[in-house]
Amino acid sequence: MALLRGNSLAISQKMLSVFQASALPHISLRIFISPPSIANIWNSILLAVPKKKTSYTKKRSRLLSGKALKDKTVNRCPICGSFKLAHHLCSHCFRNIRREFNE
């Protein structure tokens, strides 16, 4: 096992030397972070923490609010005048049509 690791290390060093010769010149960029910018980042992290625990009532009201059932649009049937859901067949007219086809 150690022999394989040594061979692979030697092979990888040879390949690295070949690729380094043909690669583009190395450019190093040094970026200096000034201490005030670190302080600003640290303050934003500290300020993101809530000061007090959220109460049970507020938590439950937030979780359960806004989930009411949506209102259904109810229209009058243009044929018989009874109430029906929008984009649905009138149940009264449907029963009449069904009765006629069954006879």
Swiss-Prot record:
Its main location: mitochondrion. InterPro entries: Mitoribosomal_protein_bL32, Ribosomal_bL32, Ribosomal_zn-bd. One of its GO terms (biological process) is mitochondrial translation. GO terms for cellular component: mitochondrial large ribosomal subunit; mitochondrion. It is found in: Mitochondrion. Pfam families: Ribosomal_L32p. Residues 1-47 form a transit peptide. Keywords: Metal-binding, Mitochondrion, Ribonucleoprotein, Ribosomal protein, Transit peptide, Zinc. HAMAP family: Ribosomal_bL32 (MF_00340). Component of the mitochondrial large ribosomal subunit (mt-LSU). Mature yeast 74S mitochondrial ribosomes consist of a small (37S) and a large (54S) subunit. The 37S small subunit contains a 15S ribosomal RNA (15S mt-rRNA) and at least 32 different proteins. The 54S large subunit contains a 21S rRNA (21S mt-rRNA) and at least 45 different proteins. bL32m has a zinc binding site. This is Large ribosomal subunit protein bL32m.
